[in-house]
Amino acid sequence: MSKVIGIDLGTTNSCVAVLEGGEPKVIPNPEGARTTPSVVAFKNGERQVGEVAKRQSITNPNTIMSIKRHMGTDYTVEIEGKKYTPQEVSAIILQHLKSYAESYLGETVSKAVITVPAYFNDAERQATKDAGKIAGLEVERIINEPTAAALAYGLDKTEEDQTILVYDLGGGTFDVSILELGDGVFEVRSTAGDNRLGGDDFDQVIIDHLVSEFKKENGIDLSKDKMALQRLKDAAEKAKKDLSGVSSTQISLPFITAGEAGPLHLELTLTRAKFEELSSHLVERTMGPVRQALQDAGLSASEIDKVILVGGSTRIPAVQEAIKKETGKEAHKGVNPDEVVALGAAIQGGVITGDVKDVVLLDVTPLSLGIETMGGVFTKLIERNTTIPTSKSQVFSTAADNQTAVDIHVLQGERPMAADNKTLGRFQLTDIPPAPRGVPQIEVSFDIDKNGIVNVSAKDLGTGKEQNITIKSSSGLSDDEIERMVKEAEENAEADAKKKEEIELRNEADQLVFTTEKTLKDLEGKADEAQVKKANEAKDALKAAIEKNDLDEIKAKKDELQAIVQELSMKLYEEAAKQAQAQQDGGAGAKKADDNVVDAEYEEVNDDKDQK
């Protein structure tokens, strides 16, 4: 079975890993980094992904960042006259990860396990699966990020029973999960979180502080200047990282803007204490889900054996301090918070291929599922934190006499009223025989698969008529749309490969021009003038083709020049070989002429005694 890669598709950074020799390994990207920024840019019709896209985001308005925040919504971003859905943008990132995983493994990769925040709802999970499909990946399993982290942490610790709290503060999402490990079983007891809280928000409080300080000093609002704002974002992210290791950092942004008197510079010292003051409300916000998860699992903080930190933002000292205070436990730091989720996904990939034995993953549904019933009430069929896969049925009836159809309004959430929860979908069961209200028996069944994706059916028990729906969010893509996007993604991959081929051809041509010039210099006075002239002409023709950027001509002229240079080199070697032979023959003749010469006697001196 071909390898199943593990992908942590993050808001800020993404990471890909694979199981090799029973051990999960992170696959470095072409730049040698172990994580890749989740950034996509479009420039002159060319797509850029990762570090290269992030670097030029200041000057390129066609740069998309943190697209994960919009998964499962009907948000679109327009670039160069074309609208892109979050699924398509995520697919471009996944395609990039897939391509360098293939280069590393030396084989085609078509299967993946992709992680999502534990608190992702059905629409967000479905969108992630669609993104994988568009990228040409068969998504074998969608697993929750904290669960993946626990897998990576606990694979070699499954003999002892442990209760683990995973605190996952990513770039744009926050999750807490409580898991029980024992006998190779990873059971999620509870999960809670906030899909609109992450490292980006910590950056934002620094940006707001810089904007307000600069406005106080210079009377100019930098938040209105797009270019300045991007520089502030980069500086804020760097300052946040610096303050994890030092108690104060200098933020210096020369020529940030211009006033009436000329250019203005931003110079400011940010202390860790000030940063903690600015972000204290965010740290406190993360404690709510921690308490919620403990309550749902029916545990007290003292019953937690280990705390694992996931996500780069957990390096913030105030965050670590808050967790320690809440749980009374020092967080375990034996795993890299940026890589642990991808490593866990790779282990789950190994479970699927059968390379990892005796590991069972029991995940849970993060939110309750149910339908709207009379009076706009939300009636739950599956409670949150139910182990998946699972199915549940309940019998309902009609609300009015002679009602021949019922609307099934499927919802996900925790609020008592239907209107306050997230609509997953609607469908209708028709042709119910007319009868007094309360008489027809309509069985509604919910089924959640191992990826957390929901199927709902309604059946009239009297007639046996059934209607079902696989939940697709309002942003859910139809099969035709996915098919079209897959085609586009493949075409783009071909275009990218063609571009790479073109660059390589130009590089080879440049290299050949350089080596030809060097060879001709070495051949001065040693080669036939006509041959040298021919080589020079071919070299100039290739240079002209490079200037014109005509690829077919470059290829033809390159092949021509290569043949001439090879011929010249061969002649040079032949000439050198002839000369060497002539010298050898000359040396042998000299030896014959000297046959009558008598060798001189010699005396060898020895320290002990003279010998003659």
From Swiss-Prot:
The lineage of its organism: Bacteria, Bacillati, Bacillota, Bacilli, Bacillales. Acts as a chaperone. Residues 596-612 have a biased composition (Acidic residues). The modification Phosphothreonine is found at residue 173. SUPFAM superfamilies: Actin-like ATPase domain (SSF53067), Heat shock protein 70kD (HSP70), C-terminal subdomain (SSF100934), Heat shock protein 70kD (HSP70), peptide-binding domain (SSF100920). Induction: By stress conditions e.g. heat shock. The gene is dnaK. It comes from Bacillus licheniformis (strain ATCC 14580 / DSM 13 / JCM 2505 / CCUG 7422 / NBRC 12200 / NCIMB 9375 / NCTC 10341 / NRRL NRS-1264 / Gibson 46). Residues 576-612 are annotated as: Disordered. This is Chaperone protein DnaK.
